[in-house]
């Protein structure tokens, strides 16, 4: 072990004496590059935050479009819009859970329109389910025909 220790200082001393200027120049460049990396990483972190904020999906635009289609002269507050958005998310989650359960009962890996239709009948009450099924059938027919 002693010879290894002797070899390392022997290698460093001649190298240090021969190129002290050459070592300083790259040493100065490396911290500059090192300083730029955290700034770039910080900028990338900001971009990630912006992307995360932009990826929040809501139904606010669609709620507003339907409202203006049904009642053009009526507005909606931001609090009411938030309530409607959470209501739609809740119904969507219930329908997805029920249709997944139905697909599992039938031992199918895929949720088809039949599972969705049955889930709508189970989750939504009475007349609302009938209207939802008819509108859904109409939308699927329009989609497949075009």
From Swiss-Prot:
Modification after translation (UniProt): Can be acetylated to form H2BK6ac, H2BK33ac and H2BK34ac. Monoubiquitinated to form H2BK143ub1; may give a specific tag for epigenetic transcriptional activation.
Cross-link (Glycyl lysine isopeptide (Lys-Gly) (interchain with G-Cter in ubiquitin)): 142
SUPFAM superfamilies assigned: Histone-fold
Keywords: Acetylation, Chromosome, DNA-binding, Isopeptide bond, Nucleosome core, Nucleus, Ubl conjugation
Biased composition (Basic and acidic residues): 1-16
UniProt keyword Acetylation present: yes
Compartments where found: Nucleus; Chromosome
Species name: Nicotiana tabacum
Modified-residue entries (N6-acetyllysine), positions: 7, 35-36
The protein's assembly and partners: The nucleosome is a histone octamer containing two molecules each of H2A, H2B, H3 and H4 assembled in one H3-H4 heterotetramer and two H2A-H2B heterodimers. The octamer wraps approximately 147 bp of DNA.
GO molecular function: DNA binding; protein heterodimerization activity; structural constituent of chromatin
InterPro entries referenced in this protein's UniProt entry, alphabetically: Histone-fold (IPR009072), Histone_H2A/H2B/H3 (IPR007125), Histone_H2B (IPR000558), HISTONE_H2B_site (IPR055333)
Protein name per Swiss-Prot or TrEMBL: Histone H2B
Family listed: Belongs to the histone H2B family.
GO cellular component: nucleosome; nucleus
Gene from which the chain derives: HIS2B
Job description of the protein: Core component of nucleosome. Nucleosomes wrap and compact DNA into chromatin, limiting DNA accessibility to the cellular machineries which require DNA as a template. Histones thereby play a central role in transcription regulation, DNA repair, DNA replication and chromosomal stability. DNA accessibility is regulated via a complex set of post-translational modifications of histones, also called histone code, and nucleosome remodeling.
């Amino acid at each position: 072990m002693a010879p290894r220790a002797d070899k390392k200082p022997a290698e460093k001393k001649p190298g240090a004496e021969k190129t002290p200027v050459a070592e300083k120049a790259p040493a100065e460049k490396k911290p500059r590059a090192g300083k730029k990396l955290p700034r770039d990483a910080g900028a990338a972190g900001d971009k990630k935050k912006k992307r995360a904020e932009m990826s929040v999906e809501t139904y606010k635009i669609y709620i507003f479009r339907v409202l203006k289609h049904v009642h053009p002269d009526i507005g909606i507050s931001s609090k009411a819009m938030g309530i409607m958005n959470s209501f739609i998310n809740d119904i969507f989650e219930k329908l997805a859970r029920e249709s997944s359960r139905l697909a599992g009962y039938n031992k199918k890996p895929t949720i088809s329109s039949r599972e969705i239709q049955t889930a709508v009948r189970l989750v939504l009450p009475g007349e609302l389910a009938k209207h939802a099924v008819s509108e859904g059938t109409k939308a699927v027919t329009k989609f497949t025909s075009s």
